[in-house]
Amino acid sequence: MSLVPIVVEQTNRGERAYDIFSRLLKDRIVFLGDEINDTTASLVIAQMLFLEAEDPDKDIWLYINSPGGSITAGLAIYDTMQYIKPDVVTLCVGMAASMAAFLLAAGAKGKRFALPNSEIMIHQPWGGMQGQATDIKIHAERLLRLRDKLERILSENTGQPLEKIKADMERDYFMTAEEAKTYGIIDDILVRHKK
């Protein structure tokens, strides 16, 4: 059972209670704070599409604290970030690992951030399969195609040579916020809230 705090706002028409995520959405903040799967991807995508419809010219902030997860769910979020008109500002608060690091790097250029004690990790996609040899081969080939796609996009978003991305993603590659900035995953480290 997860607990979601409720906040109460005073307005000229009285009090209004919101769950914390709805309140953040009013400020154009989408929070990705869980494993990336089809459910979390659908929620993030729906919020981005809603915010685009509300104001297509105003930035959307995507706060990320996630261990990563499904490649296809992550690519659905990535494609939506590229598709919508507003810039998506990304901010790592805590951890952005695997697919979450990929999304962090996919924010609008100049608008990708991390808090000082954030940790970022990239690695190659992994998966498991059992069954007939031909089915295992099909899934292995698919995984290699996805890996190639992720490496190319990450190279484009970070400015790192493709060969360096390939080498660094061979194993878990952990970075501090400062190292992620040098690497090109983020553009700056936020110490104080920028208004």
Curated annotation (Swiss-Prot):
<comment type="function">
    <text>Cleaves peptides in various proteins in a process that requires ATP hydrolysis. Has a chymotrypsin-like activity. Plays a major role in the degradation of misfolded proteins.</text>
</comment>
<dbReference type="InterPro" id="IPR023562">
    <property type="entry name" value="ClpP/TepA"/>
</dbReference>
<keyword id="KW-0378">Hydrolase</keyword>
<keyword id="KW-0645">Protease</keyword>
<keyword id="KW-0963">Cytoplasm</keyword>
<dbReference type="GO" id="GO:0004252">
    <property type="term" value="F:serine-type endopeptidase activity"/>
</dbReference>
<dbReference type="GO" id="GO:0006515">
    <property type="term" value="P:protein quality control for misfolded or incompletely synthesized proteins"/>
</dbReference>
<dbReference type="InterPro" id="IPR033135">
    <property type="entry name" value="ClpP_His_AS"/>
</dbReference>
<dbReference type="InterPro" id="IPR018215">
    <property type="entry name" value="ClpP_Ser_AS"/>
</dbReference>
<dbReference type="InterPro" id="IPR029045">
    <property type="entry name" value="ClpP/crotonase-like_dom_sf"/>
</dbReference>
<dbReference type="GO" id="GO:0009368">
    <property type="term" value="C:endopeptidase Clp complex"/>
</dbReference>
<dbReference type="GO" id="GO:0005737">
    <property type="term" value="C:cytoplasm"/>
</dbReference>
<dbReference type="GO" id="GO:0004176">
    <property type="term" value="F:ATP-dependent peptidase activity"/>
</dbReference>
<comment type="similarity">
    <text>Belongs to the peptidase S14 family.</text>
</comment>
<dbReference type="Pfam" id="PF00574">
    <property type="entry name" value="CLP_protease"/>
</dbReference>
<protein>
    <recommendedName>
        <fullName>ATP-dependent Clp protease proteolytic subunit</fullName>
        <ecNumber>3.4.21.92</ecNumber>
    </recommendedName>
</protein>
<comment type="subunit">
    <text>Fourteen ClpP subunits assemble into 2 heptameric rings which stack back to back to give a disk-like structure with a central cavity, resembling the structure of eukaryotic proteasomes.</text>
</comment>
<feature type="active site" description="Nucleophile">
    <location>
        <position position="98"/>
    </location>
</feature>
<keyword id="KW-0720">Serine protease</keyword>
<dbReference type="InterPro" id="IPR001907">
    <property type="entry name" value="ClpP"/>
</dbReference>
<dbReference type="GO" id="GO:0051117">
    <property type="term" value="F:ATPase binding"/>
</dbReference>
<feature type="active site">
    <location>
        <position position="123"/>
    </location>
</feature>
